[in-house]
Regions:
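Bacterial N-terminal signal peptides
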Residues: 18-29
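Carbohydrate-active catalytic/glycan-binding domains of CAZyme proteins
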Residues: 32-538
Length: 538
């Protein structure tokens, strides 16, 4: 629950009048709606965006979460909704089931999204095995169902490209390219080549390929990490008259934004209005990698990003006429018999260990494997957290927990802040703790979890409880605070403010709201989640 400053009646009435006036002007066409950056103040990294008709479609990275590779849709760059996923689960490795390791921070990365002659295409390479496959998936509707069209060798951060003559290419790595067979089932022999050589100032990573053709020229957009003093990121573009080169390079964006380091990695897209736009992400602390939206101006044949000063603007005109307000994170009363698209599981779920139908109106989470910590638990379910401030609470029915069970709500990441209900014999206690997971570099196997218990409260024979976590992602904060409520009482703070962090060495994503339930002694218990109530300060 978010709290805002109270104001007197006169100020409230003035504010209501102003809002009504703006609404009327907007409906009459006198005022253009705006998009405030970050366009999406949540973890939505590695975007690829295309336009098909009146809609913009976007795919992003969700790594170890299932279902994976969310497909989002918008008419205006402001109101985005998740309409589907490329896959429900990945099964190439037992690590997706948390066997022989995990895929924390790996899994699905940097997907390329395309539309060609009535078919949507998506290409991605799971990053859990660098010698593994690249998937090409197809669908007639971006919402799905998607099916595997072919599997190729590994292409890192690749872009799929259909040329005007219907020849198909994959541009990947650091300026590498190959042609695919016309059926997209393999690589044309002898077609592999490098289309440019890294320059001396490119001292760090050069990746995140996005390839387009405009006015007869070929353009490759990439992120450039420069490890020189100052360590900065920028968006660069390589341009050529022939797809195989020679290519020339230009820096098209080098800008920080909102008190955070430089913006880099994303794509450009042509708008419904004939203009071009850039969608580029930015590392923004504990909330993760957020999306910024900016003009793309063609100057001397180069796609120059940012405003007239080359910077990410604070606001942008809304790029369309969407009349609905849509969201990427929302409340859920679990009244449907199918799980909402807002939710993602941590790794592949155990389907028989959860239900929306055994007790209608509740999400039932059953214990399964016996584990010692939340990072090893199966069937943890999550949604993103959002800036600038957000709040989420869950209502839990605890009556069917058994000795040793642990359930609760987390600000979940490699560093997590937890509200945990512990069943100990016949009693219950509420624990606010902070955890840090340790993972092996190669297999991402869990080698240990550090836990700092900040505060615990004896709940005696509690049957039902509400848990709440507030997130503050305003610059310089990244703070989670914790509360609980029993019955019709007031919200009671517990523990201490927790500093949320983004750590690429661990989960490599933004902090998420996560609901968990696991057994430490014996399987067979379960909790019923009555509701998930979410709010965000716009």
């Amino acid at each position: 629950m978010l709290k805002f400053k109270k104001t007197d009646t006169m100020h409230v009435n003035i504010r209501r009048f102003c809002l009504a006036l703006v609404a009327c002007l907007c409906m009459s066409g006198s005022v253009s709606a705006i998009v405030r950056n970050p366009m999406i103040w949540a973890d939505v990294p590695d975007p690829d965006v295309i336009r098909v008709g009146e809609y913009y479609y976007m795919v992003t990275t969700t790594m170890h979460l299932m279902p994976g590779a969310p497909i989002m849709r918008s008419k205006d760059f402001s109101n985005w909704e998740t309409i589907g996923y490329l896959f429900d689960r990945l099964t190439d490795s037992p690590k997706y089931d948390m066997e022989d390791g995990t895929v924390y921070g790996r899994g699905q990365w940097a997907t390329s999204l395309r539309y060609h002659k009535g078919t949507f295409y998506a290409l991605f390479a799971p990053n859990d095995n660098l010698g593994g496959d690249t998937y090409i998936m197809t669908a007639k509707d971006a919402a799905g169902p998607w099916k595997i069209h072919s599997r190729l060798r590994h292409f890192h951060d690749a872009s799929l490209f259909f040329d005007d003559d219907d020849r198909v290419y994959v541009i990947y790595g650091t300026g590498e390219m190959c042609e695919l067979t016309s059926d997209l089932q393999g690589v044309v022999p002898g077609s592999e080549c490098r289309i440019f050589q890294r320059e001396a100032d490119e001292t760090g990573l050069l990746e995140g390929s996005r390839f387009i053709k405009h006015d007869g020229k070929y353009y490759l957009l990439m992120i450039s990490h420069v490890w020189a003093p100052g360590r900065y990121r920028r968006q660069v573009c390589y341009r050529a008259d022939d797809i195989k080169g020679p290519y020339e390079k230009k820096v098209i964006l080098q800008s920080d934004f909102g008190g955070f380091p430089h913006v880099g990695q994303g794509t450009i897209v042509d708008g419904n209005d004939g203009k071009w736009y850039g969608v580029i992400f930015q590392d923004r602390g504990g909330v993760g990698r957020v999306l910024t939206y900016m003009p793309c101006r063609w100057i001397d044949g180069w796609p120059i990003l940012g405003d007239e000063q080359g910077r990410v603007p604070d606001t942008m005109p809304q790029g369309g006429d969407e009349v609905r307000s849509t969201h990427l994170v929302t409340s859920d009363d679990f009244s449907n018999d199918k799980l909402s698209l807002y939710w993602q599981w941590n790794h592949n779920p155990i389907d028989e260990a959860w239900s929306l139908t055994e007790r209608p109106g509740f999400l039932r989470l059953k214990t399964n494997k016996i584990v010692s910590n939340v990072y090893a638990a199966r069937n943890t379910i999550s949604q993103r957290m959002e800036g600038p401030r957000c709040s989420a609470s869950v209502t839990l029915d605890l009556r069917h927990m058994v000795d040793g069970d642990r359930c609760g709500l987390a600000a979940f990441n490699g560093h997590s802040g937890l509200l945990t209900i512990v069943r100990d014999g016949k009693s219950y206690k509420l624990v606010q703790s902070n955890t840090l997971v340790h993972l092996t570099d190669r297999e991402k196997a869990i080698t240990g979890v550090d836990e700092d218990v900040v505060e615990q409260v004896d709940l005696k024979r509690c049957k039902k409880i509400q848990l709440r976590i507030d997130g503050d992602f305003t610059p310089g904060k990244d703070i989670a605070t914790f509360y609980y409520k029993i019955g019709k009482g007031e919200w009671t703070p517990i523990g201490e403010p927790f500093k949320m962090q983004f750590d690429y060495r661990r989960l490599f994503m933004g902090t998420r709201y996560a609901i968990f339930n696991y057994a430490t002694k014996q399987a067979g218990g379960y909790v019923d989640v009555d509701s998930f109530d979410y709010s965000r300060e716009e």
